[in-house]
Design a protein with these regions (language model features):
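Terminal-region recognition feature
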Residues: 1-195
Length: 195
């Protein structure tokens, strides 16, 4: 990925930084682009902690991601909740799987945005395991527990019954920005800069 550099002022000095660093330090905006994995979660959680340690001003999370690891996504979700900052989420391109969870569930109610041509995709947790029958059974119990937990969080965030979330996530369900708005996955179609 090519990231442009900017000349900006940090701590009273002109410095050259990449665009994403400037977004974090000046606008309190964090970007999740690409797969959500342990490395990206570590980086994103560090940015959230840094920003929330210095101020309780609102944060913006911009997502264009196919999703990724449940544990990495939950680390970001928990860190955002612990920050006690108001969180705005903006879907650009797509937010699928764990990215859809973050776009919908990690934001402050009323602050969930989806660009007009962006899409959201939800589905049940994915997993794979091999080994002895007892190990496979333990793994199945774990993924079912994770599914129940995520279904409840989604239902609370979207204000739909858990049975409706279960039906939507049984298979891949793609939502246009307008459909996501109608179903309560986002609060606005457009950009928060337009507000």
């Amino acid at each position: 990925m090519i990231v442009p550099n900017l000349i900006t002022t940090l701590d009273g000095k002109e410095v050259m930084v990449d665009f994403f660093t400037a977004e974090v330090t000046q606008n309190r905006t964090i970007h999740i682009i690409g797969e959500i994995n342990d490395d990206t979660a570590s980086y994103i959680c560090s940015e959230i902690r840094y920003l929330s340690r210095n101020s309780k001003e609102p944060l913006t999370l911009i997502l264009n991601s196919p999703g990724g690891s449940i544990s990495a996504g939950m680390a970001i979700y928990d860190t955002l909740n612990a920050s006690r900052c108001e969180v705005t989420t903006v879907v650009e391109g797509m937010a699928a799987s764990m990215a859809a969870f973050l776009a919908t569930c990690a934001a402050t109610k009323g602050r969930r945005f989806c660009q007009p041509n962006a899409e959201i995709m939800v589905h049940q947790p994915l997993g794979g395991v091999q080994g002895q029958a007892s190990d496979i059974s333990i793994a199945a119990d774990h993924i079912n527990s994770t599914k129940r937990k995520m279904t409840k969080i989604f239902a609370d965030s979207v204000n739909l019954e858990e049975s409706k979330i279960k039906a939507l996530t049984d298979r891949d369900t793609w939502l246009s920005a307008e459909d996501a708005l109608k179903m309560g996955f986002v609060d606005h179609v457009g950009d928060p800069m337009d507000d």
